[in-house]
Every structure is written in C-alpha cells, then in structure tokens.
C-alpha cells in the first residue's frame, strides 16, 4: 500500500514543481518585455477643460513649464502646433485646491482634431536637451489628485 502511495505523491509533487517553474519562467518573460509607449493625449470632444492641481511649493516650476510650453508651441514648424497655441489658454485660479494646491485651468477650444496635446512631447520637440529636467520638474509639481480632464462639446454659442 505504501508503494502505491509514494509514486502518486511523487507525481503530484512533480506536477506542482512543473507548475511553479512555468509560472516563474512566464513572469520572467513578461518582466523582460519593453514597457508600452504612452498613448498620445488627444481630446475626444470639440475641446477640453483640464484642471491641474499643483503643490504650493512647486508653483514656480509649473509656471516655468507653462512658459516653456508656450515657447515650444510658438517656435514649432508644425502647423498643428500653431493651431494648438491659438486655441489653448491657461488660467490660474484665485482659490486653493485640495491640500492648499494651486489650481491651473487649461481651456482648449476648439481642439485641433487628432493633435497630440502631451506636454512632455511638445517640450521634447523644442527642447530635446532639457526635456529630462523639464519632465522631472513637471512630474514633481503635481499634487494628489494631479488633475481632472473634461472633454467638452459645444452646447450653445450665446453670441450666435
């Protein structure tokens, strides 16, 4: 009876070891793959309103990034960047946000259809040697929550 039981236990242990090895090897393969590239920031509606919550002690850095973004759009040779600049306004709210964060409101209307509004992509086009430092300052400036995006569709133009 013991002889009949031992081969069954060995088989079960063998199957468990095989399963564990398969899992470990699979995890290693998944880990070794390249990270997917970020999707472009393309607005789905006629325009967008973006609220950014910026840490109070990083306001100067964020203001600098917005200035660099304006410069990047202005000096770009791409026609869609000129169109983006023409319809993109950034405001700073007088009221504080969560945890005392400064609130920045970007209004993009009309949005350029199919254009990528990723700030770091635009900065990288204009300032390739500075982009790592700019990205670091940009990323570190956000509070929690970092912001909120609203894709907007025109309901009524009161002037028409």
PLM region spans:
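Weak global preference for isoleucine
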Residues: 24, 42, 51, 65-66, ...
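Generic detector of low-complexity/intrinsically disordered segments
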Residues: 7, 20-23, 151-152, 156-157
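N-terminal secretory signal peptides that target proteins for export/translocation
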Residues: 1-11
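An amphipathic, aromatic/His-enriched active-site/gating alpha helix that lines ligand/cofactor pockets
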Residues: 34, 70-86, 98-101, 107-160
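Bacterial N-terminal signal peptides
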Residues: 12-26
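Boundary at the C-terminal end of the N-terminal hydrophobic targeting segment
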Residues: 27-34
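N-terminal secretory signal peptides
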Residues: 34-94
């Amino acid at each position: 009876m013991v002889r009949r039981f031992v081969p069954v236990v060995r088989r079960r242990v063998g199957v468990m070891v095989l399963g564990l090895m398969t899992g470990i090897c699979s995890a290693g393969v998944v880990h070794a793959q390249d990270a997917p590239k970020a999707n472009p920031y393309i607005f789905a509606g006629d325009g967008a309103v973006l609220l950014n919550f910026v840490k109070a002690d990083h306001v100067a850095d964020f203001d600098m990034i917005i200035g660099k973004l304006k410069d990047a759009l202005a000096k770009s040779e791409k026609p869609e960047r000129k169109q983006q600049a023409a319809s993109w306004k950034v405001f700073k709210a007088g009221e504080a946000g969560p945890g005392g964060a400064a609130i920045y409101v970007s209004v993009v209307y009309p949005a350029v259809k199919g254009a990528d509004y990723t700030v770091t992509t635009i900065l990288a086009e204009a300032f390739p040697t500075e982009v790592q430092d700019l990205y670091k300052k940009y990323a570190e400036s956000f509070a929690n929550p970092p912001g909120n995006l609203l894709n907007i569709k025109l309901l009524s133009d009161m002037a028409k």
